[in-house]
A protein has these predicted regions:
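Detector for outer-membrane/organellar transmembrane beta-barrel domains
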Residues: 91-92, 107-179
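Transmembrane beta-strands of outer-membrane beta-barrel pores
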Residues: 30-36, 59-65, 86, 98-104, ...
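Outer-membrane beta-barrel "beta-signal"
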Residues: 194, 198-200, 224-238
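Short glycine/proline- and aromatic-enriched beta-strand/turn motifs that initiate or cap beta-hairpins
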Residues: 19-69, 77
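Repeated loop/turn-to-beta-strand initiation elements of outer-membrane beta-barrel proteins
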Residues: 24-26, 51-57, 87-96, 121-127, ...
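Transmembrane beta-barrel domains of outer membrane proteins
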Residues: 44-48, 81-85, 93, 114-118, ...
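Residues that define the transmembrane beta-barrel architecture of outer-membrane proteins
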Residues: 37-41, 45, 74-80, 107-111, ...
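Cleavable N-terminal export/targeting peptides
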Residues: 1-25
Length: 238
């Protein structure tokens, strides 16, 4: 976690400097997963610059969910993300980026590329491919020590309903590269997230989120449980 603390300090220094960035965004979110009976808390700071760069840092904390040796997940983590927007024209944008994830298990790197299209001033579509590579090894289904690497595809739809409300949908497909399985007993899993934001002021935006996480719930040694996530949060421009 030492690397995470160093990167966190660098990002916070950048966010706090008026010479580098105009204003950061703080996002505070809590959630509950029905299948795993798990509570989560997330704190996220992000900022975009006029030259095309964007960066974020977030910390996720979970309560002690269960004891399941089949699940290769850590309960607490920190991640740092950076990307760069390349404008192809007035409607199309390509964003190559990198997500670095730190947990008690080790470090995971997620290089990605995202393509977005502004269909109208209120409607945006996007697709993204990300490859999650783990710098550490874990026991696979054959008993060998390998890397639980994942191919990930995301689709995005964002619609500004009016000046007060914004709706977003994100659909995700995960596919494990090596001999591992998700809690649904498959090499692949899906997620769908639906978010509704309410813009109280230009600087304060509360939101609600519902996610269906396939049959990835794990509780008291049982897996392949239907998993629903209910979240509520608020973002502040600092």
């Amino acid at each position: 976690m030492k690397k995470a603390k160093i990167l966190s300090g660098v990002l916070l220094l950048c966010f706090s400097s008026p010479l580098i960035s105009k204003a950061a965004t703080l996002d505070v979110r809590g959630g509950y997963r029905s299948g795993s009976h798990a509570y989560e808390t997330r704190l996220k700071v992000s900022e975009g610059w006029q030259n095309g760069w964007w960066a974020s840092m977030e910390s996720n904390t979970w309560n002690t969910i269960h004891d399941n040796k089949k699940e290769n997940a850590a309960l607490n983590d920190v991640q740092v993300e950076v990307n760069y927007a390349i404008k192809l024209d007035d409607q199309w944008t390509v964003r190559p980026g990198m997500l670095t994830h730190f947990s008690s298990n080790g470090t995971r790197y997620g290089p990605y590329v995202k393509l977005s299209w502004d269909a109208t001033k209120d409607l945006n579509f996007g697709i993204r491919y990300r490859y999650d590579w783990k710098a550490y090894r874990q026991q696979d289904l054959s008993g060998d020590m390998s890397r639980d690497n994942v191919h990930r595809w995301d689709g995005y739809v964002t619609y500004h309903i009016n000046s007060d409300f914004t709706f977003a949908w994100q659909t995700t497909l995960y596919s494990k590269q090596n001999d591992y399985r998700y809690a649904n007993h498959k090499k692949w899993a899906t997620e769908n997230a639906f978010v509704l934001q309410y813009h109280i002021t230009p600087d304060i935006t509360p939101y609600i989120e519902y996610d269906y996480l396939d049959r990835q719930g794990v509780y008291n040694g049982r897996d392949n449980l239907s998993e629903n996530s209910y979240r509520i949060g608020v973002s502040f421009k600092l």
